[in-house]
Amino acid sequence: MEKNNQYLGTEPLGKLLFKLAVPSVVAQIINMLYNIVDRIYIGHMPEGGSLALTGLGVCMPIIMVVSAFAALVSMGGAPRASIAMGRGDNGGAERILGNCFILQIIISAILTSALLIWDRDLLLAFGASPDTIGFAAGYMDIYALGTIFVQLTLGMNAFITAQGFSKTGMYTVLIGAVSNIILDPVFIFGLDMGVRGAALATVISQCISCLWVLLFLRGEKTILRLKKENMRLEAGVILPCLALGLAAFIMQSSESIISVSFNTSLLKYGGDIAVGAMTILSSINMFAMLPLQGLGQGAQPIVSYNYGAKDAKRVRGAFKLLLRSSLIYAGALWLIIMLFPQAFTGLFTPNAELAAFTQAAMRRYFAVMFMFGIQVACQMTFTAIGSARSSIAVAVVRKFVLLLPLIYLMPALFPGDKAMAVYLAEPAADLIAVTFTAILFSVQFKKAIEKLPNS
């Protein structure tokens, strides 16, 4: 690939989005497998598989926080780097890359120390029961040691994709996912390590992906190179990145808070089986959301570059294409989930009781998922044009203003089956949030475009 990204401003939008989004979508699907393959294997353990699956689900809020810190840096830094490249300032983009790299190392050290000290206390607070805490702590003790690999893989890979090297970004995830899929059964079943084996397989796989990313960013093919002289924190460089990445951090860390709220409420009203069902539902939700994010990540360099180049027509066109694609995908997947829920639950558990409970919850939890393409397309475009305040507003309203209170209100509104009522909080919040997002986006996007020449 040529060491320039002018094609982002010249190639036909349909062809360009296809070229960038397809590898990103594939990467996100692979990333989904990376994240849920542990659950699939663990759920089929011959002894205690359902409880082990529930224990792993209790770990997810902590894992989400680790990923959220990677997003704080990368989802702000990568678009800022793209905008700088659109202005022709590759040196400034490399300073952003170096600042983000060193900050992620610092964050990794802090997170690892905290998890090794307080993981059991956190897991008990996050919904672990006496029957599941052993499985949860066994997984988290090992996972914590690989925090630095998670941070650097997720964080630095965003800078590879932001340069237009979407296939290389896809390979990052592919390498880790294939490694994890191969190592999981070896450690879980072959070496009889159970959940600890799943965690060890994940850490080793992330380490391999991390090495791949760092070798690329230090190699000859990259446009932006990771340089030692840029690896020092500069407030003027890193603070704008953190401001823009705050929306992604809020979205992902709020997922952790939401997950804790779901787990504790479901444990109260439905016991371990309800928490186990939520583990399966969150896995299916990941299946739904990650490809949507892949579409957004494919469109993001196009929108950011052309916004930096002040090409209003291409910015509008890229958003419309992203919106249509997101709606088609979300609608098709919603239909499949509604018609064939058993196809999804069978992947995670052979336990008939857990499968039946999950299928009943699934139709409630995903009732309005077909609308969520609007939410993701608008959110990703806000980030791509550097509209940090709007991105934060959308994230805060959906998670904190709507979903979090509804998790606790719905059982009171529908007391007949309080456990199932908890799952209804998700579609109720999504319906209101999508409406709010669409209205806000129509106003703010118009203002942003009107500032560009020939708008």
Question: Where is each model-derived feature located?
Answer:
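Alpha-helical transmembrane segments of multipass membrane proteins
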Residues: 36-40, 113, 121, 155-159, ...
